Amino acid sequence: MSRTASYAGMTTPVKDKEGHGIPCLQPIDVVECTYQYFTKSQNKLSLRVGDLIYVLTKGSNGWWDGVLIRHSANNNNNSLILDRGWFPPSFTRSILNELHGVPEIGNELEIFQAGLNLKLELSSNPVILSLEDFLDCCRDIEFKEQLAWSPIPVHERKGCCELLYYNQDLDVYCRTLPYLPQNQVETVNDYSSFPAISKIAGKKMPITSSPDLFYLNDCDVVYWYDLTRLVCHYVNLTERDLLANEREKFLTSLDLLTAQITCVYMLFRNLRLVEDSFKKTLKKLIYTLSRFSINANIWFHSTPFEEREAIASQKDPERRSPLLQSILGTFQKFHFLLRLLHFLSNPNELTILPQLTPRFFKDSFNTISWNNPFLRKHLNQHMSHDLPRQMIKAVAGASGIVAENNDEIPASKQGTSCSSETSHHSPSAPFQRRRRGTIFSNVPGSSDESDTIWSKRKKPYPLNEETLSLVRARKEQLDAKLKQMIKSANEYLSNTANFSKMLNFEMNFKTYEEVSGTIPIIDILENLDLTIYLNLRELGDENRVFDEDVAIDDEDKEFLKHSLSSLSYILSDYFNMKQYFHDVVVKFIIVAQHLTLEDPFVFSPMQNDLPTGYYEPMKPSSLNLDNAKDKKNGSQNTDIQEEEDEYEPDPDSLILFHNLINQDSDFNDLKFFNLAHVFKKSCDDYFDVLKLSIEFVNRLILERENLLNYAARMMKNNITELLLRGEEGYGSYDGGETAEKSDTNAVYADSDTKDNDEWRDSQVKLPRYLQREYDSELIWGSNNRIKGGSKHALISYLTDNEKKDLFFNITFLITFRSIFTTTEFLSYLISQYNLDPPEDLCFEEYNEWVTKKLIPVKCRVVEIMTTFFKQYWFPGYDEPDLATLNLDYFAQVAIKENITGSVELLKEVNQKFKHGNMQEATAPMKTLDQQICQEHYWGTLYSTTESILAVDPVLFATQLTILEHEIYCEITIFDCLQKIWKNKYTKSYGASPGLNEFISFANKLTNFISYSIVKEADKSKRAKLLSHFIFIAEYCRKFNNFSSMTAIISALYSSSIYRLEKTWQAVIPQTRDLLQSLDKLMDPKKNFINYRSELKSLHSAPCVPFFGVYLSDLTFTDSGNPDYLVLEHGLKGVHDEKKYINFNKRSRLVDILQEIIYFKKTHYDFTKDRTVIECISNSLENIPHIEKQYQLSLIIEPKPRKKVVPNSNSNNKSQEKSRDDQTDEGKTSTKKDRFSKFQLHKTKKKAPKVSKQRRRMFDFLLSVD
């Protein structure tokens, strides 16, 4: 940094006591810091508001050189710290001339200077500090940081052998080179490294000083310099109002100043700053403020207004009255005491101050009495209510415990008076509740009586049409009563002669009856199942680290993030609606109560005279005297404007109002309205909020369907699984007629013998040595299928010598990996092959056992193993431990024993494990048809609108069906199992090439169709493309190609296409109706009931099914059903967990897999056109992403300025239905605007204002943890 200065202080050489010449510094100015400035640089000064800096040099480059003196962090108050460095002058103001007029204030100035150990006598001429004064000042000064020296050799002068070192940054000479200690430099961000913090580091900080404990406003006081700036503002404002002769404003400013001084006193006590210097200064400060307040009030009361106006307008201070001069002198002393207090508090200025104003705890904002499901609950078994996480950490930290939640805090620290739930009913429980509670035990509403509806209801209401019907039915019941009440109010307004107390009491009674009927609606709003939105927030968190078994690519993450940003506003409006519902109901009750009062203003004295937030700190931008306004009057005027109603006043009330004004009576700004008119307006608001609740419930249901519809149509079963995880009813799968209607995971042991009676009776008639050993551990279902059993029982039934259950065998071999490892499964089979005979058998019984059981079982074992290796073997089943089984030796032993099929078994074993041809031996793992790619024939791409329109829709649909059916035939059962199991049972499955290729093709087709439309700038051509693709989708339906049909529909209902209203208007209505019929077929409501019915009607016809339904069924069946059944013994009530395999779950999976395989058997009898197929394949590559397409959509048809655009993630007609519903219920643009902007109050000119603090809370509840 350059040292060139416009003007600089003089450097006068002086000699010390030893006679050496050392330059002496001369300050040229004294400045006061007005704005905070922090820096990490060692050659710059960090400034706080109120600091005094002695300027040594004013550089031309905009930086000044100065010295800053502060108290040190030691307990000795006389110990000082000297800092020298560069600082920006724009953060300071010169006070050199102001210090001349400081009034006499007794010994405070001498005490202040004595504390500095300096003798500063500032005059009009610059003061030259002698070497002795400078050394005396710096003798006991401790440097805050080790200074960085840059020594520069000086040329030797004649007659002088002394070598001086010069620091260019600080412009200081020295004789010796100070070597810096090799200590690790701590970062400036660590507050513990500051001396300001070290002074109170050993003290126990208050709980409320935690930085992350509350939701804070921007204007909240956090550090000392914030408080100093706020107090100084009110001091200046009070002085200005005094000199301006504005009595009301002066009293308001003085009241606010007194409140801030009270906060200062409370902070000193909370921080335990009990030094004598603090106590004396605070007492003098309060005394001076009291004296100033008394004298100012005497001034305003004893002096007439005109005289005060004349005296205050005098510019010459000497011509003012002695009383005013005395008041101003007292105020100057108050100024000095504040500066002295700031100087004393400098060592603590980086301390986070305790919070004194009321604020919400973080993670605990529950929107008044409503439940907030987005709040992460940290429940403890000893506590009935969840507590704010930050409050738990603060209380635990104050108790010497490091804990993140309630579970890590001992019960003794949580304020619980009992060790178990039953202790509440003990005789000593009442006495325990009388003890002094802690912060945990005194949580409002912690009793059972004050629990919300949420805690009383076990199951939440699902987001479906049934819940919406409940709300609508209840609203219709309330509407009839409400219309009658409005009719009664209208009759009174038309004829006041019918006024009577009985009528008012009757309306009041009907109001309570009406409100009590609202409880079911409140119950539904309080207990809506918002699990899918909770999961969406968790998945949309950028900082979330997903488990290994969760496969989410970049495209999925972008979709989740986009959906979260779109739905956050809807959820925020939903919570605002719930709060508004609460406000309307309360107002409805209060207005009804007013009808029964003779004097409707009897409760007016209970109203607080001060507006809400009167003592709230002001924003930094408002701390300007030029822009400062009267806080009290301004707030009241704002409230009056916001709360101004459109009620028509009663004529009689107006006459009374004017009479009171003429009599100069105090009417306290009361408004005289017709109460019946007010009651009618409240009924209208109540009626509107009921309708609004239906709209929001319907909106949440539609958005939920949109999310699931997108995931299903894009075949993203992993997204569907993650979104629905934890939702009530998740995992329920209706597999058709074969599925059990009432299937529970708990099975009674005395009921598993009721099915399959005939076969079991035959088993009972057999000799004991021929009966199955584990037959009692099998659980049968109502459809004569094995529902569950132990591992031994399942293996025994698999290798049974009498009954061959083909479906059971297939299910077992397909899903065995979810029950056993490969080594364990084959070990069980080998053990079954080597059965031990029962004890106490005679020779004849033994021979019968060998002939009728052992040999048949051995044959069954060999047959099962051969079938397994030949048809159901997958390379991912290979394990290192399989070598220990010696399967080739086992097969050779079976050959020597002449077991049927043993030779073929040996062949399969050698082929799988010795020749290493596992990939070729697995017939299911067949690659895609590569003939087209091998010929390297490149056709013309469908890259233009003309080329796409030139292809006949029938030809396009035919070739598209052939291509997609070929890809569908490459899907194997292992692809499907890998898609749902992932790494759940084994990490060696690998990818699912066939299924991934099929899903990728469908998604590419969707992107190709949407991109082909949005890239076309001409509206008429876009309309032709829309009609063209609709016709292609219709022909795909005729060919039973539901996969391509769904991909086309998804593209046409995507956000970038659906919003093109002008383009859709150019499509003829018949074509749009055709698209709606296709979309109705693939409607996801009721688990794609229309599509499933259409699919069941197909018998032997070829078909390309929509695979998203299968993925959903597989995902729900696997994730929604447990792997094990719990056996409940009816007599003993004993639970034996994880013993009985839930085989019914595996059977359902195989049912779905069989349907997938079924449609691979029948092929289309179409002629393949390789040119068209090649063009289709090549056109699907390198398509821009959905975000790019949406940008193109905005270019061809920009958003209307005053119209709400649909959500970008709407992929079906549910949004169109939402628009229709809103149109039917609204019919007017006024109501639509009120709904979108949330301007709900009919009786007010403005919408209910949501504070900035509440908006910040909503942002926390719906964003990343």
Swiss-Prot record:
Output the Gene Ontology cellular-component terms: plasma membrane
Which residues constitute the signal peptide according to the record? Answer: none
Q: Which residues form the SH3 domain?
A: 26-97
The protein's matches in SUPFAM superfamilies, at most eight in alphabetical order, are given as: Ras GEF, SH3-domain
Protein's UniProt keywords contain Magnesium? no
Q: Where is this region: Disordered?
A: 409-454, 623-648, 1201-1252
Q: Which CDD domains match?
A: RasGEF, REM, SH3_Sdc25
What GO annotations for molecular function exist for this entry?
guanyl-nucleotide exchange factor activity
Spans of biased composition, class Basic and acidic residues? 1214-1236
**One of the GO biological process terms:** Ras protein signal transduction
Q: Which keywords does the record carry?
A: Cell cycle, Cell division, Guanine-nucleotide releasing factor, SH3 domain
Which Pfam families does this one have?
RasGEF, RasGEF_N
Described purpose of this protein according to its UniProt entry: Promotes the exchange of Ras-bound GDP by GTP.
> What other facts are recorded?
Suppresses the CDC25-5 mutation in yeast (restores cAMP level) and has similar functions as CDC25.
The record, for PANTHER family, names: CELL DIVISION CONTROL PROTEIN 25, GUANINE NUCLEOTIDE EXCHANGE FACTOR
User: What is the name listed in the Swiss-Prot or TrEMBL entry for this protein?
Assistant: Guanine nucleotide exchange factor SDC25
